[in-house]
Structure formats: structure tokens, C-alpha cells
UniProtKB/Swiss-Prot annotation:
Annotated positions binding Mg(2+) 2: E429
Alphabetical GO biological process terms: lysyl-tRNA aminoacylation
The enzyme's E.C. designation: 6.1.1.6
Provenance organism: Clostridium acetobutylicum (strain ATCC 824 / DSM 792 / JCM 1419 / IAM 19013 / LMG 5710 / NBRC 13948 / NRRL B-527 / VKM B-1787 / 2291 / W)
Cofactor note: Binds 3 Mg(2+) ions per subunit.
Protein name listed in UniProt: Lysine--tRNA ligase
Residue pairs linked by disulfide bridges in the UniProt entry: none
Pfam families tied to this protein: tRNA-synt_2, tRNA_anti-codon
GO molecular function ontology, one term from the record: tRNA binding
Broad class of enzyme this protein falls into: ligase
Amino acids binding Mg(2+) 1: E422, E429
Gene that encodes it: lysS
Keyword tRNA processing: no
Amino acid sequence: MSNDEKQLTKEEMKAIKLQAKEEAKMNDLLKERRQKLSDAQERGKDPFDVYKVERTHTSKQIVDNYDELEDKIVTVAGRLMSKRVHGKAGFSDIYDRYGKIQLYLKIDDVGEEKLKEFKTFDIGDFVVITGKVFKTKTGEITLHVTKLELIAKSLKPLPEKFHGLKDPDLKYRQRYVDLIINQDVRETFMKRTAIIKAVREFLDNKDYLEVETPVLSTIASGASARPFSTHHNALDLDMHLRIATELYLKRLIVGGFEKVYEIGKDFRNEGIDVRHNPEFTMIELYEAYADYNDMMEITENMVAYACQKVNGTTKITYEGTEIDLTPPWRRVTMVDIVKEHSGIDFSTVKTDEEAREIAKEKKLELKKELKDCTKGDILNALFEEYGEKKLIQPTFVCDYPVEISPLTKKKRGNPEYTERFEGFIYGREICNAYSELNDPIVQKDRFMQQLKERELGDDEAYQMDDDFINALEIGMPPTGGMGMGMDRLVMFLTDSPSIRDVILFPTMKPTPNRD
């Protein structure tokens, strides 16, 4: 055994001993808390026998209305988060949904027995407090306690500092603890709700109709992604969780709903990183008689509206970079952005073979074999390699190749491209939009081409959807459509570095069970 291995063994033994010591300490704390619960139950004061609490105010209401409530009696409820009681008096803090309210206890007001009982309360316990509103000499709004009651017992101690925990993923695995400890996390998720509300408000004000479409279907289409699959026992039918809402929403356009949107969960059986979670929230919207230019206008104004609503401005700081979301956003073609950042003028490339030579020269990473790549595939790869990360300020990249846009109308005046754009902020895609293809003959041909792509090994290529073709044959008017990842929008508007920071319970690999 080498010296390094001996040293490693010593370190491991030290860690094991430390863990055993910490576990023993934790076991003692758990026993102590359970004993306190047992003692309370023996006194006929089982906190778990409390069914309903009548509180008169929240912490926010007291702070916001202090002038009216000064010297008034109020009742609040929340989690005990600090306790500083010495002798016959002391201060404590409880937290509710909105934040903190300070308590002042004095033996003359609550009595000796109640003060003694309060001293047995633990950090994390839930209490209901009645008291008079006043300000301390330092100006802090406080309740002078006259009544108190334990209404739920915390049997496990909270971590004192979340960042001191050994498992860096614990805040995602046990989000309930993260929400208790970190006020800024609570604020992020409250802001998330406000952002989604603002988006709804914006679209409702423009006479869009919110709808719901199936989450389970026999065909997973509307996006380039692998689905999650399941089996319906009663129907003996293989089904998939949706990867997009697009094709159902377009059916509603066919049916006469001229402006529709849906905010809901999509599911894609793909990797997990700072921008991707297998279960995520999307908004898709479609408007009859509109095109992708209208969708650009809707998109930039919707984002700016939501940002103004929740942040009071259309300017944000994301990971230290100032970003201005004020419309209008920059518009640039994919060909031009590739030329700007790589020097390659793709408008002069005439054949697939010319494009493949460029791909070889630039050593591009491609999603399929070079011999199977078209001009469009290679242009997109050049954009991803040279252009995408440079788009810090809000930018609409327009006119994508037809080969990678199977649901999109061809560009007016240039049929090699389509009327499609993607929006980028901080080098990241935030939305995807089209002048929607409504020609059933062309759409069926595009689906057939996608089937060939699947045969070549692209399991993210679109599947054939015969019923959607049937809907197009019934007739769909010219339509503009847009899809946006709501989680990514929330990331930007809350300055959150990871998608897991804006999803309450992100997908995580299970931890081994411990006895």
C-alpha cells in the first residue's frame, strides 16, 4: 500500500468517525424533541390535535398597516425561527408566507407557566401568537405577546445554514427545507407565479383564449425530442407524454378558435443540465391571419410586459450582465449572423457538397453523418458553433433552413429558407416561432422526409400525424405561432443561474435509502 493510499484511508476513517459523531448528536436531538412532544401530550396539549387557527393578520399586513394597527391586538401564526429568552423576558422571530415578525415576551404578560412552556419550544415549531403591535427602540415592528400556543411540533431540527450542508443538491431534493431557510428562494417562486400571471394577463388582454390539450397521446410530435412512453392497460395502447402542444393547438385554429394559448407541462426524455429538465413548463400561442413578424412583436412585448410587472423595469441583470428587454429587439437572419461571427457567407453556398466541405474545414460537430447532412443542417451547425453564444442582448434570429423546420412556411422570395425565428437572450434560446405551414400536401411531404431522418437514426425527428394532416385538409387559415420555455423566462427575470432554481421540485436521481 502506498503512502497516498494510507493517507486516503486515514482521511476516510476521520470522515466516518465525524459522520458517526454527527449522527449520534442528531439522534440525541431527535429523542429530545420527541420527548418534548410526549410531555406536551401528557399535559393534554398535543399540538397535532389543533385543527384550525384563527389568525387576524399576516406579517405583511402588520408591517404595511402599522400606523392603523399600533397598540391594537392581533393574532398571527407561523414557524418559530429564532428564540432569545433569558430569565423573565426575551425576543423571538416567527416567519409566515410573507416574512418575519418579531415577538416580545414578558413573564408579567403571559404568566410563569406559559413562559416556561415557551422555553421548551424548538426552532421550527409552529405557533399561534396574540399580542399588541408596537415598535422597539430600534424601530422594529414587534408583537408584545399576551397569548401563545404550540400548534405543530417540528421533530427534526432545521440546518442552521443551508450552504453548510454536505449535499449541495439537498436544496433541490428537499425544497421544503430550502423554502424555510432562504427568503430569497421563496421570493423567486413567488415571482415565478407573478410572471406566469402577467403573461396570462397580457394575452387575455389581447383576446387570446386559454385552452387545455391532451398530455397523453398516441403520437408525440410538434418538436424534435424523444418522448416518455407508457401503456394504457384498458385500451391496450402505447401512449406518450406530450413533447409539445403545437399540433393540438393548430387543430383548434382549424376549428375556428382564432387566438389560442396554453401554459402547461411538456416532457422530453433527454439530458439534464442548467437549462434542461425532463419536465418543464411551456407556453405556446397561435393566431389566425398572423405571420412570424406578428409573433416577433407579440413575443417582445409579452416579455417586456412581464418584466415590467414583476421588476418595475424592462432592464435586468443576468449573471452580472445588463440586458435590455425593451422592444424592439434586434432582428437578423441566420445567414447574416453566421457571416458576422464566422466570416462565412452562406448565401454563396449553392450545393450540399459545398456545405460539407465547409463542415470538414471547420470540424463541425454534427448530429448525423456528414454524408447525410444537407446545406441546412450545416448552416444550423455553424450558427450553433459561431453565432448562438454571441447573442447576449435580445435577438430574433430569422429565416431558418427548410430542412430543420418541418412545420414552417417557406420564406417569401427564398424557398430554401423558412419564416421561422428563434429568440435568444444571453446566448440562450428562449422561444421558437413560425409562419405556420398550412398546406396539407407540403406538410405530408415534410413528415415523410422526417420519417427518412428517423430511419437514418434520428430518433428526435418528427413522427407522422395523419389526423393532423386531416385537420389541415379541412383547412387552416394563415397562422402565426410561438412557443416559449416559461422556466427559462423565469430564470432571466429572477437572475437564476440554473433551471433547477426556478422549478420547485426538479427531476433528481434518487438517493439510496438509509436505515
